[in-house]
Amino acid sequence: MILLKFKKLKRYYHLYQQNNLFGELTLICAWGTFDSNRGGHKFIFCKNQLELYAQLAKISKIRLTRNYRLY
């Protein structure tokens, strides 16, 4: 499930929530450019929904200060 999408000219940053095979909450951060296949992702494992929302707030603040916009 996509939680937030950010974009900046030719770049994007997406945040997904997903449970892994062990039932743990996982926040998946994916980034890259619109015009190529280059990019990456990382997994942040959260103990509960509250921790996941705290991570979302932290990442959103960073993205917005770097001139990304929500879409």
Model-derived segments and their meaning:
Residues Y12:
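Double-stranded DNA-binding cores of transcription factors and transposases
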Residues M1-K8, N37-R38, Q49:
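Negatively charged, low-complexity tracts enriched in Asp/Glu with abundant Ser/Thr
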Residues Y16-K42:
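Short aromatic-glycine-(Arg/Gly/Cys) micro-motifs in beta-strand/loop hairpins
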Residues M1, K7-K8, T26-C29, R63:
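Alpha-helical structural elements
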Residues K8-L9, A54:
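Extended, non-core accessory segments
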